[in-house]
């Protein structure tokens, strides 16, 4: 992360005028001789990889090829030293490929610094991560290992070459005893939001495949931008971890930026509730957290504002201070922080707490251990569930802005008596439901209608907002997606040129900022498997894009050669274009997106705190205003669909 002064400068520019800051920035010129050597090395490694595609350790080799390929093709060598590092990666990748060809994979049994990779569900790209494997590790040892996830700070030049090389040289800030430390790449520099958030969970799942993990001793830690990552991940997924230790960073957008001139749109103000950790402070009731700051570091602001929000929830934030220091750890503070964190880790996570305090603003984040919010009364208003197991046959819960809730206690939870029915007090209403099963598990689903709670029926076929199907537009890029390229003639030339430009930009930006090659197919090539497994990003209009033509009649927008109609509003089709997210009428378990990639643009690149969702569920873009580094054009209308994916007269304000 950049120093605060530079971050504030970026915000000022962002507020006053569009700023075009490319990320990554253009690299240095690579001498022709080095280019030839690197290309030859890539070709040799690619030839070896061809015969290894079915090997389960294929990603552990492929990541070396991708790292060098991206740096070379994308002009992403930023220092002369990186050219040497790239050659080293090709050498190591070649050695690993040769080992796999012999049926060996020695790095899978190694201790110390190990780099590995996995294939992401989002775009099929290989993503790297680093490990510090303790010297006590052995594949034959019957032991479940504590895992500390470490989130790195910001570096605009942190390409895969630097990440992999550094992870083979540098053990990092903390190396707890008998602990596997997982160093996340996080798909570059995004403070673990969007695809960067998914990277953490995918990398952790990959670690689980290869190492025995103690599920009750997983911790999240990081510094600077990595501290921001920890605040985000921990606040939204509090009961997944034993402890959190954020250092510096940021915890929200507007107060961190301290720019009174910047006035967000009404929908941006609502969308901040997606990513602001401050809005989820109540969830730290479930998770021990210790914040670190240098006493002279302006980025103490993150912990200061989290402490304020936690105080409003009746909690006092534990803090460790580095004395007479700015943006760094002191040796003494590291010792104290390690002592405290290790004590919490030794105790481990309370897997099945009797009491849950949970807040959310969206069904994207709908679970806090055994409490699951299935439906909201209104997205982007605060929802709460305070639930408690009173005794072995009764549960009490109080809710706000919740339309449906489930209680799901898994095997061995054993909080309720299997020989007794359970009485549930839900917002003062008493309901008697079947008791726990003999494995200790218990599940009950409730839905509110006309102010009254009742046991809920299965409504899987009902069109409504639900977890992972709630928007906004950016949500489509947290799971498998395919960009669907139009092959027909556009309804209007201006719109056709704009959609092509925006599609090209989205593909380019995905590679640069989220480090993958966006899957792209012609509209004539979309298969049943694509419909079943992926969100479809439809570019063009109902005439140019055959898939869009198939679903158009079932969307809450009408689009002809003359007009775009959104409820009671009409926009000229010659100079307007809709962007939106909606359940795919051909497979309502997946999304379609019309004419949009992820929604923050270049003006957000000055500070990771600006890298947030910029557009809601839908918008109409006026193309008489050209795209800039903030918007795809003038936003003539925008809004959120209702809880049944219906168009609201208020636009969801």
Q: How does the language model describe each region?
A:
Residues 17-61:
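Amphipathic, heptad-repeat alpha-helical segments
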Residues 18-28, 74-145:
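A domain-start/cap signature at the N-terminus of enzymes
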Residues 136-142, 193-225, 235-241, 283:
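Gly/Ser-rich "nucleophile elbow"/oxyanion-hole loop immediately N-terminal to the catalytic nucleophile
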Residues 144-211:
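Active-site machinery of serine-nucleophile hydrolases
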Residues 153-167, 239-287:
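Mobile cap/lid helix-loop segments that gate and shape the active-site cleft of serine hydrolases
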Residues 292, 296-395, 401:
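C-terminal catalytic histidine-bearing segment of alpha/beta-hydrolase fold enzymes
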Residues 396, 407-653:
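Solvent-exposed alpha-helical segments and adjacent loops
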